[in-house]
């Protein structure tokens, strides 16, 4: 079952990765080989987890790159669904079969 309002994955990075190891933002950025600002933007929800950042998080803290990306996708979808009523599109055709990923 999908969460209706999942938290930004930056919170998981902060509380599940950095905090237990008592790492500061600067120390975490050094571990991940990113700028302090880039990590801070992720932690405060200004930036999302890219595929590259997911690999960095996987290598540094575990958790599987795919899982980090799924967390970001779930958050992004929940945010988009909040605005779904404002998205104006015209249906072109009905599908005979559902699209599968």
Regions found by a protein language model. Name each.
Residues 41-44, 70:
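Base-recognition residues in the alpha-helical recognition helix of bacterial helix-turn-helix
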Residues 14, 39-40, 65:
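Alpha-helical structural signal
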Residues 5-6, 26, 59, 65-67:
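Peripheral/terminal regions associated with large enzymatic or DNA-binding modules
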Residues 35, 46, 61, 72-75:
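The DNA-recognition helices of helix-turn-helix-type DNA-binding domains
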Residues 63, 69-101:
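Short, charged recognition helix plus adjacent turn
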Residues 1-23, 70:
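A short, Lys/Arg-rich alpha-helix, primarily the initiator
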Residues 46-59:
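Short, basic-rich loop-to-helix N-cap that marks the start of a DNA-contacting helix
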Residues 22-41:
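Short alpha-helical DNA-recognition segment
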């Amino acid at each position: 079952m999908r969460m209706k309002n999942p938290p930004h994955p930056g919170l998981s990075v902060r509380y599940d990765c950095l905090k237990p190891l008592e790492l500061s933002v600067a120390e975490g950025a050094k571990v991940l080989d990113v700028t302090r600002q880039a990590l801070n933007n992720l932690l405060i929800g200004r930036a999302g987890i890219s595929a590259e950042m997911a690999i960095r998080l996987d290598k540094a803290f575990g958790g599987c790159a795919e899982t980090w990306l799924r967390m970001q996708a779930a958050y992004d979808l929940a945010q988009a669904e909040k605005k779904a009523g404002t998205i104006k599109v015209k249906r072109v055709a009905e599908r005979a079969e559902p699209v599968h990923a």
